[in-house]
Amino acid sequence: LPASVDWRKEGAVLPIRHQGQCG
């Protein structure tokens, strides 16, 4: 995710598995 986007805020609405793929 772009540094301009707070992953903590976006993570609240995005599926956890999405974070797993990116992180």
UniProtKB/Swiss-Prot annotation:
GO biological process terms held by the UniProt record: proteolysis
Regulation affecting activity: Strongly inhibited by the cysteine protease inhibitor E64 (L-trans-epoxysuccinyl-leucylamide-(4-guanido)-butane). Not inhibited by the serine protease inhibitor PMSF, the aspartic protease inhibitor pepstatin A, or by the metal ion chelator 1,10-phenanthroline.
Pfam family, one: Peptidase_C1
Gene3D superfamilies per record: Cysteine proteinases
Domain of life: Eukaryota
InterPro entries: Papain-like_cys_pep_sf (IPR038765), Peptidase_C1A_C (IPR000668)
GO function term, MF aspect, one: cysteine-type peptidase activity
Protein known as: Philibertain g 1
